[in-house]
Amino acid sequence: MTIHDLAEYEILDEHRVEDVQSDGFILRHKKSGARIAILSNNDDNKVFYIGFRTPPEDETGVPHIIEHTTLCGSKKFPVKDPFIELAKGSLNTFLNAMTYPDKTVYPVASCNDQDFKNLMDVYLDAVFNPNITKYEEIFKQEGWHYELTGKDDELKINGVVYNEMKGVYSSPDEVLSSQIYRSLFPDNTYSKDSGGNPEYIPKLTYEAYLDFYHKYYHPSNSYIYLYGDMDVVERLEWLDKEYLSLYDYKKVNSEINKQPAFDEIKNVEAQYSITMDDSQENKTYLSYNRVVGDSLDEMLYQAFDVLDYALVSSPGAPVKQALIDAGIGDDVYGSYDAGILQPVFSFVAKNANASQADEFESIIENTLKEVVKTGINKEALLAGINSSEFKFREADFGQFPKGLLFGLNCLDSWLFDDMKPFIHLECLGTFAKLRKAVDTDYFEKLIQEYLLDNTHGSSVTVKPKRGLGNEREEALAKELSDYKASLSDEEIKKLIEDTEHLKKYQEEPSSDEDLRKLPMLTRADMKKNAMPFSNIEDELLDVKVVRHDIESNGIDYISFLFDAGDFAQSELGYLGFFTNALGLVSTEKYSYTDLANATNIYTGGISTGTASHPDIKDRNNFVFKFEVKLKVLEKNLDKALELMEQMLLTSDFTDTKRLGELVAQIKARLQANLSSSGHLVAAMRSMSSFSRYALYQDELKGVAFYRSICRIEKELSESPKSVSDKLAAIAKKLFARNRMLISFTGNNEAYGNAKPSLEKVIAGFNKMSAVGNQAEVHFNTAKEAFIDASQIQYVAKTGDFICEGYEYTGALRLLRIILSYDYLWINVRVKGGAYGCMNTFLRSGESYFVSYRDPNLSDTLDVYDRIPEYIKSFSPDERDMTKYIIGTFSALDTPMNPEAKGSRSLSAYLEGITYEQIQKERNEILNAQPEDIRRLADLVEAVLKKDSICVIGNENMIKESAGLFENVEKLI
């Protein structure tokens, strides 16, 4: 039987989607009206999703709350948290759900056929038959609820989505984004935040929430996607029989209307919170925003990505440089959102002065007029096109399956035209047209039409306000106090009973009967053997080469690593700045603008970074490298190496104006990252009180690096030459053959072809640079808190089990899954209301527990301290134990692209990890019994006894717990 024989479906279109090596089908389910798009190919990492068009009508976050709650039990699978049960016990390569401004999507992926079928079944039952209509507690837990534990206690609001969005709205970047869409689309759905504004989330009633679900969650409003190597006919037959045939077509009014264009540009102002003692100077965000056509225009869809690069995102781009030269903003960047009906293009200046708003706008417009008049730099356009095309062809999305990203890309057009799911995947022809257009005035006309003459736009200014977060907290506290005062004794009693009832509901585990309804694999389904490493040593001109014989589709992945272990701790801040500046300053032959363009024209990117590797055999031997990575088509290797050589050996650090621009940009981006990635920052900072690895991470990327950048900024203004000299000295010290190691990922033929080019570039480096002993370090304080203007916390507690005499085993990988998806999930997220909580045990001994967007502080630390007690009483049955093992294997066996396989092999080489070790750990996981986990209780107790904590978050919460900390200071 073929897809053409399925009477239940109408084939609307079928054709070869050559650009993604797939056979494409567009179907309609006749009875229900469900839309189906299929990309059939030989990729065994199969992907499924079902999505719904879900336009919000207000700011209560109802689409977001439904996304959370549909995965809290269903008719066929009534367990309370099937999402977590699947995370524990499936071989998924992706498992999540996402709320967008206009749609909600539920994707899964797996390389295992039976697992893929299981995941599809659970997700489809979740969206069509969720338990949300039976249990209001689900809505309260994930959305919001009043919390009152005693009649004299303070009335509070809690809920996972509520706390998540409090964290989101603590970020000025997010405030700016929401205000941009509100300003541009006042009359359609894009003016409403689908995620929810914490001010309005508590206005959502259970009834309105259910109404939204019943309105939009129907097959007639659905978008179903299948990708990969599967029996498509079998899947479609099953889909019809089990779900779609149960529904008749229903007219669902979910269409998104276009926003009529404005007659004039809108001006909008908003505020974000900073702490009471923060300066308000140069903390304003300025934006220039325009609506650009519609998302069904294939040329515009790609062209404005190219214009983003050519006008503002690339080093020295004209709009960026004009604003920086005028002293407007520390960081200037572009933003292009093509995933909505009417795409939006923005220029943004971060850390500007509010008084510069008019000048900001006039500089942008004058620069654009000049660009239109004189023409855009053709090299910049070609660089932008090549960069986009290289990324598309490589299809490297890190840990995410490429089929998932292809599927999400489909929705950028499919949501607005049932016949056009694949138009943005068939883009190689578009890139060819854009290349031809470089020699015409096509791009200049786009600028004139959409950025200069277009009145459908806005200027949004977001200003800082001291203590705004505290004002909102106080206003909420008063509102809740007044509300409580208005209640009768009976109503207060009811609130207390509701709070107790919800806690009991949360504490009551799913029954064994319900748990057994969830489909599950067996231990026999697990791959017995670990993925091998590929490390083959070679030597070129006395430089060691580690090559990884891996098929890489004609792309060479090369890393040049330089020993940096003798850099003093006081030098690490400068090394961090050097890492960020290299490739963004001029060289002997290239201006920094031309260098960036040439890099993007001839390569898939040249990046710099640092890599820290503990030596598993010798704990005192810490491997610290400066790393330069490049990816390039074999035919362009010589050019790529020439560009890299220019960067490493001839970079000009005497242009202190340029250094000042880079310092300001790094500082601005760090300010955003320290808050948005607060969980990782807190974990590393906490471990930096005892771990060299974590200390280096903090010095090069975390709180210490931010402090160093602030000092370097001051030094540049007072003694610019000293900064230039230090950067030049780093280059001279680092880049020598005796410090060099080369990693090459590609097949044997590719390496053979590359050897002459590699030898040529090696010969250009000095032979020797004095290498000192491993530097001494001074660890940070063990108990710290950092205050920012957010309304939530990131709470970390860390330790080191190797120092306490324990060894790393595969059982620790298993314990991480058990804690993440059981104990921590239930106590920190479900009961505590935090958005997330995670833990890790590294081979080198460092371990952490950390929460994410957490309304609590000391309560979360108490949860961590009770972990050993939980482990001691751990007694799952065989089915549950197998589930944890399967979930652990899911993380172990994530599919990898060629670059990732090479990086994995290189890390093992540098850390002294053998295949025998990882196979032993794999066997320990596969054969683990409950007693193996219980034996880890003492190890975890030793980790927690280190009592190293770090909290980033709300000022009032930190001050209430001030006794926990030896050091409390502002984060930024």
Question: Where do the language-model regions lie?
Answer:
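Generic recognition of flexible, low-complexity loop/linker segments
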Residues: 94, 210-214, 273-276, 319, ...
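Long, compositionally biased intrinsically disordered regions
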Residues: 432, 445-533, 671, 680, ...
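Non-catalytic terminal extensions that flank enzyme cores
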Residues: 1-47
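A conserved hydrophobic secondary-structure block that centers on an alpha-helix together
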Residues: 72-73, 196, 200-222
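Active-site His/Glu-centered metal-binding helix of metallohydrolases
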Residues: 62, 66-70, 578
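Non-catalytic, conformational "gating/processing" segments within enzyme and secreted inhibitor domains
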Residues: 158, 210-242, 723-758
